[in-house]
């Protein structure tokens, strides 16, 4: 019996060791990602302007997209930068964030000092975000990529 237990423990140890040494085939970085993508709301807060949420390297920012010449003129005046139709421009940085991705790869939680956001249904072209502010109020946002909405990005104004 001692021999059996010894072999069982040895077998489990080897299995655990081999499981920890899985080859990284690079598939984890493929597929949809909530970070590094300009996420757009379909609604225009002002004529010719679309708001953009951008998450990258632990920094959450709001950008704006100039959908028309009128929107570009408005953004140029507001940001004091030269903005043309089709440009994306930083309007204001929001805060730092941390992200916890769920195992399914299409959902997770984004935590920041200004509140918490839960995302789900992540695809290459869209994501549903439920945002909770510090007072517990919620907002549901269906966000899309510009490519999906059919608008070209002609440049990013820093």
Regions found by a protein language model. Name each.
Residues 2-10:
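Sec-dependent signal peptide recognition
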Residues 34-59:
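Short, solvent-exposed loop/hinge segments that bridge or flank secondary-structure elements
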Residues 43-46, 62-70:
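A short gly/proline-enriched turn/hairpin at secondary-structure junctions
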Residues 45-48, 114, 136, 146:
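Glycine-centered tight beta-turn/hairpin loop motif at sheet-sheet or coil-to-beta transitions
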Residues 56-59, 122-125, 147-149:
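A short, sequence-level motif marking secondary-structure junctions
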Residues 65-136:
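Contiguous, well-ordered beta-strand patches that form the walls/edges
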């Amino acid at each position: 019996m001692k021999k059996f237990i010894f072999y069982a423990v040895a077998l489990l140890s080897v299995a655990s060791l081999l499981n920890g040494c899985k080859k990284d085939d690079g598939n984890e970085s493929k597929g949809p990602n909530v970070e590094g993508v300009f996420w757009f709301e379909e609604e225009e807060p002002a004529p010719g302007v679309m708001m953009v949420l951008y998450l990258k390297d632990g920094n959450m920012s709001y950008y704006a997209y100039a959908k028309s010449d009128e929107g570009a003129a408005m953004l140029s005046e507001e940001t004091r930068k030269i903005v043309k139709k089709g440009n994306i421009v930083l309007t204001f940085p929001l805060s730092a964030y941390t992200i916890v991705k769920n195992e399914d790869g299409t959902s997770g939680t984004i935590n920041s000092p200004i509140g918490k956001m839960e995302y789900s249904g992540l695809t290459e072209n869209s994501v549903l975000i439920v945002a909770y502010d510090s007072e517990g109020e919620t907002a549901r946002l269906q966000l899309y990529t510009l490519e999906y909405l059919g608008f070209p990005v002609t440049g990013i104004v820093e």
